[in-house]
Amino acid sequence: MADVSTSEPIVIDLPGGESIEVNNSHWTEIASADWNHLRDDGFVQWTQTICRHEYGRILVYVVLLPTSGILKTAGEILPAGTDVTDAVERLAQRFDVPSNVPYSCIQRYRRALRESR
């Protein structure tokens, strides 16, 4: 699996051609799920993550490491308090993420919200 939790920043591609670096002190991971799959030509790895910015915005993103080894990313920044479900599912569809990954990520996010109250 791609180690997206390292100290190296990951550049997430956002809509409109913008991008953002994550894995810094401004974004706190709330929930994450990952999966890898062996194909004839090697492993494919998916990671889906939900982070909260220090000012409350939410970043939902997916990282795909295909057998080519070229990292692909996509993400969306949502206003504070927005339901993340649609964004998580939309991004998962973009990279054919197995359904257990967005499901687990959403469930972990909801659990984290309940525990923080």
For each feature predicted by the language model, list its residue ranges.
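Short, exposed beta-strand/loop patches in secreted or surface proteins that constitute
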Residues: I20, I50-C51, P79
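Generic structural motif
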Residues: G17, H53-Y55, L65
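A short, structured beta-strand/loop element
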Residues: I58-S68
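Mixed-charge, Lys/Arg-enriched low-complexity segments
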Residues: P66-R117
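Short, charged/polar N-terminal "headpieces" of proteins
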Residues: M1-L38
